[in-house]
UniProtKB/Swiss-Prot annotation:
Pfam families: Sigma70_r2, Sigma70_r3, Sigma70_r4
Region (Disordered): 57-92
Keyword vocabulary terms for this entry: Chloroplast, DNA-binding, Phosphoprotein, Plastid, Sigma factor, Transcription, Transcription regulation, Transit peptide
Induction entry: Induced by light, especially after dark adaptation. Induced by both red light (660 nm) and blue light (470 nm) in dark-adapted plants in a cryptochrome-dependent manner (i.e. requiring CRY1 and CRY2). Induced after three days of imbibition. Promoter specificity is modified by phosphorylation of Thr-170. Suppressed in response to infection with the necrotrophic bacterial pathogen Pseudomonas syringae.
Consequence of gene disruption: Lethal.
Family, similarity comment: Belongs to the sigma-70 factor family.
Signal peptide from the UniProt entry: none
Polar residues compositional bias, start-end: 57-71
Protein name (Swiss-Prot/TrEMBL): RNA polymerase sigma factor sigA
Species annotation: Arabidopsis thaliana (Mouse-ear cress)
The organism's place on the tree of life at top rank: Eukaryota
Subunit architecture: Interacts with SIB1 in chloroplast. Binds to CSK.
Function according to Swiss-Prot or TrEMBL: Essential protein. Sigma factors are initiation factors that promote the attachment of plastid-encoded RNA polymerase (PEP) to specific initiation sites and are then released. Controls the transcription of the psaA gene and thus modulates photosystem stoichiometry. Thereby maintains a harmonious electron flow and photosynthetic efficiency.
Amino acid sequence: MATAAVIGLNTGKRLLSSSFYHSDVTEKFLSVNDHCSSQYHIASTKSGITAKKASNYSPSFPSSNRHTQSAKALKESVDVASTEKPWLPNGTDKELEEECYDDDDLISHSVEAILLLQKSMLEKSWNLSFEKAVSSEYPGKGTIRKKKIPVITCSGISARQRRIGAKKKTNMTHVKAVSDVSSGKQVRGYVKGVISEDVLSHVEVVRLSKKIKSGLRLDDHKSRLKDRLGCEPSDEQLAVSLKISRAELQAWLMECHLAREKLAMSNVRLVMSIAQRYDNLGAEMSDLVQGGLIGLLRGIEKFDSSKGFRISTYVYWWIRQGVSRALVDNSRTLRLPTHLHERLGLIRNAKLRLQEKGITPSIDRIAESLNMSQKKVRNATEAVSKVFSLDRDAFPSLNGLPGETHHSYIADTRLENNPWHGYDDLALKEEVSKLISATLGEREKEIIRLYYGLDKECLTWEDISKRIGLSRERVRQVGLVALEKLKHAARKRKMEAMILKN
């Protein structure tokens, strides 16, 4: 037999001699091979192997195609080897050669069984390796978990629609999370302290309210003690008047303070919700929140838990009052009274009602609908004029740098508002003062200063004569001569333009 046949049979020999199975076919195959090579006789035992046909063979391992290809390659190598002339050693007899050719038929019959046996052995070996791999992934378990095959079901909705829906849901969740975080930051920006997110029960509110009431009674007692003593009482004096120790007094004050803080912090979100309704009406959000917190503290002090009302229902109106007052005080550059703000609100609502009916909202119709005089309506509408600073930028700057202000587009015709005019007056006074000091004598200086009011006192010739002790005519003559001296000196110093102008 050819070398290729020997190689193929040797491969089958290795497979058959493995530790998986041992049968009489193995012994027979080995005896035949040894007989052909070393002149031993073939055993007459028949094979007892029963194997399935290749058509009925359906391996459960996923790589069954590779098994089939390996078996097919082995069979092809054996078929090619069977067509070639078998190899015999030198010096063999003719009988031995015929005996080897008779054994070829037996080998061809056993090849089919060998191939089927190889398939089953490879399947067992691969299944064993797979079991080892699975057992290593899931240690401590005696049984091997089978892989679950996903079952695809049709839901009636396309995959694209499911992806779009999942994306929208994710975006909505992200926006909600961002809004919660931003609202929390906004509240923390206006309020100092830890904001309570848990809703207090009515029993807890009643307990805290009683502590706050006891603190208010303590403040009243302290104010009465201050009136009797005439000064602010110390902690020792207050504790003695209450017949308690100083430590008990401090613990009492601390409990009242903590109760007020806890009850206020649990209602901060209510303040924010009310303040947001008055946003964009001219006042800053921080001012509205501060006004609402002042109203909240006032409502907590006034709350009576014995009447059975919820604290949020009671403090709502106090918070609203505080926010509205903050709006009145901070919404305009020029503050308007509270009653005027209320009147403006009534006028605004009356205008909306008239416009809905298709009526032009004039002053007389608004006054008639509100049962108010036309003068009050006119005064309120005239007070609504907006006030803005001329130092503001006329146009928004794109590069962030300050641009032209309203002063560049609005001219002021009044001379006293011109800054250069004041500078000119000051320079003229200094020049005239130097000219008088350098040109005139003492009497002439006094007469000129009193007559022209250079010392902020303007007198007549007669008043000057009474003060100096000269006649009126003599004072007038001295004054006129002094004025001529000043004109002559001014011409020399080239001050004619200033003298003629002024």
